[in-house]
Swiss-Prot record:
Modified residues (N-acetylalanine): 2
Residues where Phosphothreonine is found: 201, 204
Designated gene of the protein: XPO6
Residues with Phosphoserine modification: 199, 208, 224
GO biological process, one term: protein export from nucleus
Protein name, per record: Exportin-6
Length: 1125
């Protein structure tokens, strides 16, 4: 015993040293090695058993339990049965003897170790494992311990990790399911006993549900439940011990409910009991009582009581989240809704002492979250089922949800409730679409609730009604979606407004427009307060209170303009004529407001509080332009309705809008406002396309400004947008006009002069024999290239989907610039930033204008690129120029993707050199690099080469098909095909999951479209190599997220030759598997059933993978020299 005693002292001092602040990392590593070596010794567990019973040192106990955990989970198979019996007997005794004195984390770890033994040995070798747990629960002294054991068992056995065979996992689940009824009965008993013991009056269980009751239940869903008397009893004051037992019991239930099916085992009395405890979260009176009685030592604090409510709601939500509800359980579900709604009524009840909001503020935040989760689950999972019953009091439910939503104490809580309304509105919209006949009846049922919702959501986004809360919102920090808290708040609110608008357009419009009108009056009335001062114009509103009110009004106007813009889609299409007058009213107001802002230059005005009011004024102006832009599709429809008579009304709308835009296209205007004006101009040119646009003086003015070499250039983004608009005015066909009225000749001349002006400096860069390139600083040259190509690329990109005539004119104008680009390209091949921009330009040309460029010139471009991108140049770009260099190569490969997809024979002569470039030059450079750069583009190019040029590799003749039924095509260019397939195979051995997913999809597509897996060369030389690689990937768990896709791909490959798979491949695969013995291999083979349907086959694949890993784990854990029989 002395050696054990000595070892314990040594271990204690090592542990103390390890966790001491002064211990070096070097020494810590030495101690770690020492401890690991000790744990690996056979029989180390005996020392650990002694340590556990003899030490009070937490570190030593934790280490000893880790040794046991390792022994049981990794080495149990090799432990002699006598030792196993001893461990199974000693550890529970140790737990029983010390559970009251052990720190909770040590006790929980010891429970987990005992459950791990049960996971391996119950019921065969550890038959009393579960009986012991039940006995612990039933004995009052050990109830808490039994509940901890039960929860751990549910966690570890119902959803075990992968270190068990599939058969054992299934056996454990079945064993546990057999115990469910007993366990639920015990838990119900515990909760009821505690409740009854502490209740003022004795509770009687509710009547069991009888069939035929559901109609009454439905109509009374928001009335007091039959158990209301019970739910109205004062909540008992629990002592600490009882609260602890109840919280453990509820935690057990929540975990059990996460995996057991809904069935009669979940009795009405259990549900009612859970609801009793759910009241702990929402009964403020009881919390106050608890705090009054809190002076007595043994009473539970209000916070602890709140936690019981949270746990009970977790149980309810676990049941709610199950989509599949058996018929016999539906009644219970209705009872649950009834009882929860009863609690919701309690929470949202107004009385003198409490407003709803103050009551919600007093509740535990987690409890509110759980309640919101319940409502979300009710609407998303069960409303469809419940709402179809005519007895369901849907309006009362919405009233409750309304009160609950608009009294939320936090922004997050409010957002979550808006989500629920969004789900409800989506449900309603889809219901109406599927039952158009009942549309009126459905809408009438909900109309009042929806109008109320709309009004309240609109009030919530206005400072006029909600200033205190709105000012708390952060409008500076961007979240993951690149929006601020305020923007998110506004966006979510406007989504609800839009969804109501879709259902009730007239109501929504008549609610929103007057509110907008009020705020517009304030804005339009500012003109009278503008005075001229020495330095310009000043807004003569200085009183602090007036400034604050103006700030609020401007913020509200900005939000309401966004709301009006969001609703634009509900005025077009089939309803254009019916809602024309409303839309016209809106558009006229918007045109008036934008012109007003531009004319009196509110964006440049001096104000009393410049840091607040100036951004407000700029924002309103920008939002008015953006709202008008949202109506561009309506204007386009208006344009096509009036195109013959060009009614004055329409002409005025467009020309006034241009008068509002033109003054803003200036370097003196703030970017936010400038960009809003540019976007509106683009929409007029692209979406509306009125014939007379080009002749409006304001548009002429913009043309002159942009083509004037001496004018200051706008910021990049604005310059690109304005040039796009001007180009589109000249290039896009006018709607509803025949070809002979399109005035192409004059538009073509104008477009050529526009492009000529925009590319003047760029074309001058071209060296010529007469005037060799004049030296210009490199940075200046780069700037000209960047500025010109960004504009030209955008113009081409925006014309690429248009008519042939538009593209022809575009290319004629661009032709010289394109030739200059090709001439300049070799000079900049070592400047990767310039090459990147040039290749972007060429890629856009290839995608949009390759027909217009013509074959000879296109061939010249491709040949130039192929010559420039030598092996050395590619290596320099990929290996030494970082991300820009890689981007250059990726763009080049993208251009080649366009080339190989081109139908017809024109570019076929390039195929050999493109494949050679890929396989002999690019692939060797990137194959072994861990970085994913360039790989995705290269494999996409290889895939497109195969997909669009299948006959380059497989020549199929009609005669062959007729003669042999299924054509065994003639194979050509076999070495290239094999090399490409090998590259795909290699990519599956690399860690990059995105590349793996992409390439697996490519192979599957080639099989679906071209029967890749059936081709003789693939079938005979590659098929089972691919299956082998994919199986190994599953076994190594390196790409676990793609389990399902890999399983399907293995099935598709195996199904080409099932006989070969079962008879040859599978035995061969198992023979080659290391780490498993012959007997285990034969079990694995036997368990793989010869099913040929997809679900069974993939299930067999996953079973094989799981069990192979399990056997390896077991075998690794056996002591050296173990003889297995």
């Amino acid at each position: 015993m002395a050696s054990e005693e000595a070892s314990l002292r040594a271990l204690e001092s090592l542990m103390t040293e390890f966790f001491h602040d002064c211990t070096t990392n070097e020494r810590k590593r030495e101690i770690e090695e020492l401890l690991n070596n000790f744990a690996q010794q056979i029989g180390a567990w005996r020392f650990c058993l002694y340590f556990l019973s003899s030490t009070r040192n937490d570190y030593v106990m934790m280490y000893s339990l880790t040794v046991f955990e390792n022994l049981i989970n990794k080495m149990w198979l090799g432990v002699p049965s006598q030792d196993k019996m001893e461990i199974r007997s000693c550890l529970p005794k140790l737990l029983l003897a010390h559970h009251k004195t052990l720190p909770y984390f040590i006790r929980n770890k010891l429970c987990k170790v005992i459950v791990d033994i049960g996971r391996q040995d119950w019921p065969m070798f550890y038959h009393d494992f579960f009986t012991n747990i039940l006995q612990l629960i039933q004995s009052p002294v050990t109830t808490p311990l039994g509940l901890i054991m039960l929860k751990t068992t549910s966690e570890e056995l119902a959803c075990p990790r992968e270190d068990l065979s599939v058969a054992r996992k299934e056996e454990l689940r079945k064993l546990l399911l057999d115990q469910v009824q007993t366990v639920l009965g015990l838990l119900t008993g515990i909760l009821e006993t505690v409740w009854d013991k502490h209740s003022v009056t004795a509770a009687t269980p509710p009547p069991s549900p009888t069939s035929g009751e559901s109609g009454d239940l439905l109509s009374n869903l928001l009335q007091s439940p039959s158990s209301a008397k019970l739910l109205n009893q004062p909540i008992p004051i629990l002592d600490v011990e009882s609260e602890y037992i109840c919280s453990l019991a509820l935690e057990c239930l929540a975990h059990l409910f996460s995996w057991i099916p809904l069935s009669a085992s979940i009795t009405p009395s259990l549900l009612t009991t859970i609801f009793h405890f759910a009241r702990f979260g929402c009964d403020i009176r009881a919390r106050k009582m608890a705090s009054v009685n809190g002076s007595s030592q043994n009473c539970v604090s209000g916070q602890e009581r709140g936690r019981l409510g949270v746990l009970a709601m977790s149980c309810i939500n676990e049941l709610m989240s199950k989509n599949c509800v058996p018929m016999e359980f539906e009644e219970y579900l209705l009872r649950m809704f009834q009882q929860t709604f009863y609690l919701l009524q309690k929470i949202t009840k107004d009385n003198n002492a409490h407003t709803v909001k103050s009551r919600l503020e007093e509740l535990d935040e987690s409890y509110i979250e759980k309640f919101t989760d319940f409502l979300r689950l009710f609407v998303s999972v069960h409303l469809r089922r419940i709402e179809s019953y005519s007895q369901f009091p849907v309006v009362e439910f919405l009233t409750l949800l309304f009160k609950y939503t608009f009294h939320q104490p936090t922004h997050e809580g409010y957002f979550s409730c808006l989500d629920i309304w969004t789900l409800f509105l989506d449900y309603l919209t889809s219901k109406i679409k599927s039952r158009l006949g009942d549309k009126e009846a459905v809408l009438n049922r909900y109309e009042d609730a929806l109008v109320l919702l709309l009004t309240e959501v609109l009030n919530r986004i206005q400072f006029r009604y909600n200033q205190a809360q709105l000012e708390e919102l952060d409008d500076e920090t961007l979240d993951d979606d690149q929006q601020t808290e305020w923007q998110r708040y506004l966006r979510q609110s406007l989504e609800v407004v839009a969804k109501v608008m879709e259902l009730l357009p007239t109501h929504a419009f008549s609610t929103l427009f007057p509110v907008l009108q009020d705020n517009l009056e304030v804005y339009l009335g500012l003109q009278q307060f503008i005075v001229t001062s020495g330095s310009g114009h000043r807004l003569n509103i200085t009183a602090e209170n007036d400034c604050r009110r103006l700030h609020c009004s401007l913020r509200d106007l900005s939000s309401l303009l966004q709301a009006v813009g969001r609703l634009a889609e509900y005025f077009i299409g089939d309803v254009f004529a019916a809602r024309f007058n409303d839309a016209l009213t809106v558009v006229e107001r918007l045109v008036k407001v934008t012109l007003y802002g531009s004319q009196i230059k509110l964006y440049n005005i001096e104000t009393a509080v410049p840091s607040v009011l100036k951004p407000d004024l700029i924002d309103v102006h920008a939002q008015s332009l953006a709202a008008l832009q949202a109506y561009s599709h309506w204007l386009a429809q208006y344009c096509s309705e009036v195109h013959r008579q060009n009614t004055q009304q329409f002409v005025t709308l467009i020309s006034t809008t241009m008068d509002a835009i033109t003054p803003l296209i200036s370097t003196k205007v703030q970017d936010k406002l400038l960009l809003s004006a540019c976007h509106l101009l683009v929409s007029l040119a692209t979406t509306v396309r009125p014939v007379f646009l080009i002749s409006i003086p304001a548009v002429q003015k913009v043309f002159n400004r942009i083509t004037d070499a001496s004018a200051l250039r706008l910021v990049d983004k604005a310059q690109v947008l304005v040039c796009r608009a001007l180009s589109n005015i000249l290039l896009l066909p006018w709607p509803n006009l025949p070809e002979n009225e399109q005035q192409w000749p004059v538009r073509s001349i104008n477009h050529a002069s526009l492009i000529s002006a925009l590319s003047r400096d760029y074309r001058n860069l071209k060296p010529s024999a007469v005037a060799p390139q004049r030296k210009m600083p490199l940075d200046d040259t780069k700037l000209i290239i960047h500025q010109t190509l960004s504009v030209l690329e955008d113009i081409v990109e925006n014309i690429s989907g248009e008519s042939t005539k538009s593209r022809q004119i575009c290319y004629q104008s661009l032709q010289e610039s394109v030739q200059v680009s090709l001439a300049l390209f070799p000079a900049f091949i070592h400047q990767s930033d310039v090459t990147d921009e040039m290749l972007s330009f060429f890629l856009t040309l290839f995608r949009g204008l390759r027909v217009q460029m013509g074959v000879p010139f296109t061939e010249q471009i491709i040949q130039t690129f192929l010559n420039m991108f030598t092996r050395e140049q590619l290596a320099e770009s990929i290996l030494h120029e970082g991300s820009t260099g890689c981007r250059v190569v990726e763009k080049f490969l993208k251009i080649l993707q366009v080339v190989v997809q081109e139908p017809g024979q024109v570019f076929k002569p390039f195929l050999p050199s493109i494949i050679a470039l890929c396989m002999e030059q690019v692939y060797p450079i990137i194959a072994e690099r861990p970085s994913p750069d360039v790989k995705a583009e290269l494999f996409e190019l290889l895939f497109r080469t195969l997909h669009h040029n299948w006959r380059y590799f497989f020549k199929s003749t009609v005669l062959a098909s007729v003669q042999r039924g299924i054509a065994e095509e003639q194979m050509e260019n076999e070495p290239q095909f094999s090399a490409i397939m090998q590259a795909f195979g290699q990519s599956f051995l690399q860690p990059d999951i995105h590349l793996f997913k992409q390439n697996l999809f490519y192979l599957e597509t080639l099989n679906t479209k071209q029967k890749l897996y059936h081709k003789k060369i693939f079938r005979t030389a590659m098929l089972f190599q691919f299956v082998n690689v994919l199986l190994q990937v599953l076994v190594h768990k390196s790409h676990d997220l793609l389990q399902e896709e890999i399983g399907i791909a293995i099935y598709n490959m195996a199904s080409v030759d099932f006989d070969g798979f079962f008879a040859a491949f599978l035995p061969e695969f198992l023979t080659s598997c290391d780490g498993v013995d012959a007997n285990q291999k034969s079990v694995l083979g036997r368990n793989f059933k010869m099913d040929r349907d997809l679900p069974s086959f993939t299930q067999n694949v996953h079973r094989l993978v799981n069990d192979l890993r399990y056997y390896r784990l077991c075998n690794d854990s056996l002591p050296p020299g173990t003889v297995k029989l």
